[in-house]
């Protein structure tokens, strides 16, 4: 079999976009909610989910589509945020409470909007500001669940395509049945398959996939 020409790509090309975001049952509610902007309640929405489910990609796809300002959670630029849609990631990890309060107020004004990403619900975040407490308790949320097979297969295909690799179709169900349910893990597997193929001048096959999963401790028999 002729060896495939491969590209070394450790990062995805270009800015995140809705077109590149792989949709499936695990993220359908979140995608629909994000695309409903600017009709969010109070101009606000929080995307919740554990690491590796696609929160950041979806949030940044929205930011790219609506030309949102991406602000620093610890020191948000309120002047830049005025009259603009705003993205604030990891909002449950060291955010400025006063800054967040002002961003929520700005979100309800014309041209505004505030999209947060977090692992925990806003209602559980600590704050000594009574007004912010009430806002966080009522903050609209939508959750992305662990990636389902539709999403994982889609991202595997995209990561393989980014590296100009065309594995046999049998590789996909084999990986899906055994890999961890995480987009970063999917990316790591494809990267390692690419590297292993280059090192041994081997095509990506089911046999190579098994070897990589065993080596990474990701085989779940």
Where are these regions (language model features)?
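A short, basic N-terminal segment
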Residues: 1-36, 198-221
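Walker A/P-loop nucleotide-binding motif
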Residues: 42-58
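Post-Walker A helix-loop "phosphate-sensing" segment adjacent to the P-loop in P-loop NTPases
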Residues: 63-75
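Conserved P-loop NTPase "ATPase switch" module shared by AAA+ and STAND
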Residues: 72-106, 110-120
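Short regulatory helix/loop adjacent to the ATP-binding pocket of P-loop NTPases
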Residues: 122-137
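Conserved AAA+ ATPase "sensor/coupling" helix adjacent to the nucleotide-binding pocket
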Residues: 139, 153-166
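Conserved AAA+ ATPase "SRH/arginine-finger" region at the nucleotide-binding site
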Residues: 139-151
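C-terminal helical "lid" of AAA+/P-loop NTPase domains
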Residues: 173-177, 184-198
